Every structure is written in structure tokens, then in C-alpha cells.
A protein has these predicted regions:
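Bacterial Sec-dependent N-terminal signal peptides
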Residues: 1-27
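Extended soluble regions of mature proteins
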Residues: 21-251
Length: 251
């Protein structure tokens, strides 16, 4: 009963800032669906691509934000969250992944990447130049991902070693999360002992537009990336016994 009351109080407090700021940025021309595996958990992401702007987000986060901010559907989300908490110690797979609450926007026209993120109950906007990892391409190492022939590339990027597979048939310098800068779209990525990402589908028709999502009308504070990482790693910010998922970036 206490758990139910807490969830209701939390969700209703968010409804006080029910969003009006969500807006379309531009039409999309392609959407890549990615499936991620982290420990015993999974998530599903979209890389939605327009002419100038692409966005990367968790489908499950988008659904939670959309339904949770709607007074007509918020109770369904509350019940889902309660069941998830009750099943937390069971061996069932959970919907969970590093930085799953983030919305990332990559603007190729101005060369900037913007990340909308949070640390506990504070919300931040990080703007940086589009990252350019130093890739080593392994021409002799290939694999097929959803029917596309892909070439392997490796890099050490922001504290983690990444191995990715990119497809030159789709000549876009994009990929999941902040991975990109190769002569083809990244369709799979692996960080040993941390995370697996693999494309599950590519959509080309009847696509939603590239959209700035802010259903809760959150007020984001500008912060630089390194200050954010320092703040996010501060254990005093979080309540006791909070289970923390490692961040995508370590440095």
C-alpha cells in the first residue's frame, strides 16, 4: 500500500508540469531500431534520422514519458512500475540500460550534439561538438547484420573500448548513442563486459518525424559534459540503497 501511494504521489507531482514543449524538428527519412543487452536486462532504441538532425532514444522511455504525462493513462504506468519493483529480485529480464532516460540529438548542419539527461531529480542539457572517435578499421573482419554486410572498426572512446560493425551500403556517418564518424551506418556495437547493441530493423516508410520530446516540460539546466559526469558520480546525490547503472561515458 505504501509503495502504491508513493508511486501515485510521484507521478501526480510530475503531472504538474504536463508538457507543452514537445515539437517536430523535421521529417525523418530513416529509422533504425536497436536492441541492447546489459547484464540480465534489455532495452530497445530508435535512431531516427532526418536531413540535418538525428535523434536517439529508448522506445520504452518514450512510452513512459508519453503515457505517464497523460492523466488518462498515468495509472497504467504506475501499475507497470509497481510490478517492475515487485519483480526486481526475480530472475526475469528487466527493461533497463545505461543512460536510458537520455534523449540525444545530433545536428549535422551545425556540427553539434545535444543530450537531455538527468541526475536523480535534476535535469541537464549538454551541448558539445559531434564526437569524432579515432577509429581503426579492420577490413578483413566482417559480419552480416540484418542482411547487410558490415565491416568491423574499433576505438577507445571516453573510457571504454568499443568494437562496432558499419555498413557502407548505407553511407551515413551515424550510429547508436554517440558512436559515429565512419563511412557507413553503425549497425552493431559491443563493449566487452558492459553492453551489446544490434540493429533489429530498418524502417523507411510511414515514419514519425524527428521530434524534440519533453512531455513533462522539464526545465533543463545547461552543463558541460565533464561537470555532468562528476555530478552523476557523486554518491551523496542519491538516496541510500539506490542501484546505480554505470554510465556510457567514464571520462
Amino acid at each position: 500500500m505504501k509503495l502504491y501511494a508513493f508511486c501515485i504521489t510521484f507521478m501526480l507531482s510530475l503531472l504538474n508540469c504536463f508538457g507543452q514543449e514537445t515539437h517536430i524538428i523535421e521529417p525523418s527519412i530513416l529509422e533504425i531500431c536497436y536492441h541492447t543487452k546489459y547484464l540480465n536486462s534489455y532495452d530497445d532504441y530508435a535512431l531516427r534520422i532526418g536531413k540535418n538532425v538525428s535523434e536517439y532514444f529508448s522506445y520504452h522511455t518514450l512510452r513512459f514519458d508519453s503515457l505517464g504525462s497523460n492523466p488518462e493513462t498515468v495509472l497504467a504506468i504506475i501499475n507497470e512500475k509497481i510490478k517492475a519493483i515487485q519483480n526486481n529480485n526475480k530472475t526475469t529480464h528487466k527493461v533497463e540500460s545505461p543512460n536510458s532516460r537520455d534523449y540525444l540529438y545530433r545536428n549535422l548542419e551545425d556540427g553539434k550534439m545535444t543530450t537531455y539527461t538527468q541526475v536523480w531529480d535534476s535535469y541537464y542539457k549538454i551541448t558539445e561538438d559531434i564526437p569524432t572517435p579515432e577509429w581503426v578499421i579492420h577490413e578483413d573482419s566482417t559480419r552480416s547484420v540484418i542482411g547487410f554486410n558490415c565491416t568491423m572498426a574499433t576505438t577507445h572512446f571516453r573510457g571504454r573500448d568499443w568494437k562496432v560493425w558499419f555498413c557502407e551500403e548505407i553511407p551515413l556517418p551515424l550510429g547508436p548513442w554517440k558512436l559515429g564518424g565512419l563511412p557507413g551506418l553503425i549497425l552493431a556495437a559491443h563493449c566487452d563486459g558492459f553492453l551489446d547493441i544490434i540493429a533489429s530493423n530498418i524502417k523507411r516508410e510511414q515514419l514519425p518525424p524527428v521530434t524534440f520530446y519533453n512531455f513533462w516540460e522539464k526545465k533543463y539546466k545547461d552543463i558541460d559534459r565533464l561537470s555532468y559526469l562528476k555530478k552523476a558520480s557523486d554518491p551523496t546525490i542519491y538516496p541510500k540503497n539506490t542501484t546505480k547503472i554505470p554510465k556510457m561515458e567514464l571520462e
